[in-house]
Amino acid sequence: MTIKNIKTGLKLWSVNTDHYLNEAKRLFDLGVFDYIELYVVPDTTDTLSAWKTLNIPFIIHNAHFAHGFNLAKSENKARNKEIYEQSRLFADKLSAKYIIFHGGIDGDANETANQLASFKEQRALIENKPFVALPNRMGGNFCRGATIDELKLIMDTASCGMCFDIGHAVCSANSQNIEPYAFLKQLKTLSPVMYHLSDINDMKSPYDAHPHLGTGNLDIKWVIDEIFHEGACVSVETNKDSKESLEDFKKDICYLKNCQNI
């Protein structure tokens, strides 16, 4: 297996300014990871000064449907713009390389594409999604940006890149009755800029989950070898077992780095 010199990312939320912020600094100083992917919860710009104290590279993740952001519906347009402007502020102040967006739920992919294009955000990346939303949690039915055609439409219209979420892709493949690893290969043709990674317990499920690396059934070594490009940014999006420590994340990173060297 070829060593890909992957750059690993820690996923945090803007409200995580208590224990996780200090833990992030400690682990970064130890060389455990390379950047923070920061999900900006709406109306939390008061936390920006705390994140600015860290001398760590950032990627920004715009808020999604659970926080009222839905690019797929025209009636959300005004609030979508307000939420985006807060993410833009974080990205500007933290010198973030990218801002990641979800395509929304239900609605229409053309609306998603046009609203994202209206931001004129050169750092924008669209993240591929599962085909179906999590039941009893997301309040909708179908995710935009789950298929090759919708992703191409959004990327072409908004002139944006793609954030390739491996787990989301497997979920979408199952909903579309496509062999999961074959669908991963198909998505690779869209030339993704960066990646999200967690393990997968049920490789036949249409629903998203985030188990720790090495605890599920995803062939992570295959993903590294066949999907990730040289020097890729890979945000590890596994569940956090503690509200104070990030040692579980550290173990995930060790597993990922070991997979590169086999």
Name these PLM-found stretches.
Residues 11-15, 39-41, 63-65, 104-106, ...:
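Active-site beta-loop-alpha junctions enriched in small/polar residues
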Residues 1-86:
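N-terminal pre-domain/capping segments
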Residues 70-161, 248:
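Active-site acidic/histidine proton-transfer and metal-coordination neighborhood
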Residues 35, 59, 125-127, 163-166, ...:
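Generic enzyme active-site microenvironment
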Residues 40-57, 89, 110-118, 148-155, ...:
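Short amphipathic alpha-helices and their capping/turn segments at secondary-structure boundaries
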Residues 1-7, 22-29, 81-97, 157-161, ...:
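Histidine-acidic metal/acid-base catalytic patches
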Residues 30-34, 129-137, 167:
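Short, basic, glycine/proline-bearing loop/turn elements
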